[in-house]
Swiss-Prot record:
Residue intervals annotated with topology Extracellular: 29-75
UniProt-recorded name of the protein: Protein myomixer
InterPro entries from the UniProt entry: Myomixer
Domain-level remarks: The AxLyCxL motif is required for myoblast fusion.
Coiled-coil features, chain-numbered ranges: none
Principal location class: membrane
Listed transmembrane segments: 6-28
Gene Ontology process terms (BP): myoblast fusion; myoblast fusion involved in skeletal muscle regeneration; plasma membrane fusion; skeletal muscle organ development; skeletal muscle tissue regeneration
Record has Disulfide bond as a keyword: no
Motif stretch (AxLyCxL): 58-67
Pfam families xrefs: MINION
Tissues where the protein occurs: Specifically expressed in the developing myotome.
Keyword Membrane annotated: yes
């Protein structure tokens, strides 16, 4: 009999653990989507305030450099 209870307990723990993990993933996805939207809006507003073409080109150059560095680390 105790073996049956241990089996049931492990099944219940797995069930609740998987549901909790799924809920956590959904919450994280919603938070990241919202944060990305806000960040995009902020960056767009900053970009519109920059009037100098040279400044915009310098910023884009820095962003491309950072992206290339990140790509090299992944490989």
């Amino acid at each position: 009999m105790p073996a049956v209870f241990l089996l049931l307990r492990s099944l219940v723990v797995r069930l609740f653990g998987s549901r909790l993990a799924a809920s956590g993933v959904q919450l994280l996805r919603r938070i990241l989507t919202t944060a990305t939207g806000h960040l995009g809006t902020v960056l767009r507003n900053i970009w519109e305030r920059i009037s100098s073409q040279q400044s915009k080109e310098a910023i884009l150059g820095c962003v491309l450099c950072l992206l290339n560095m990140h790509k090299k680390v992944d490989n």
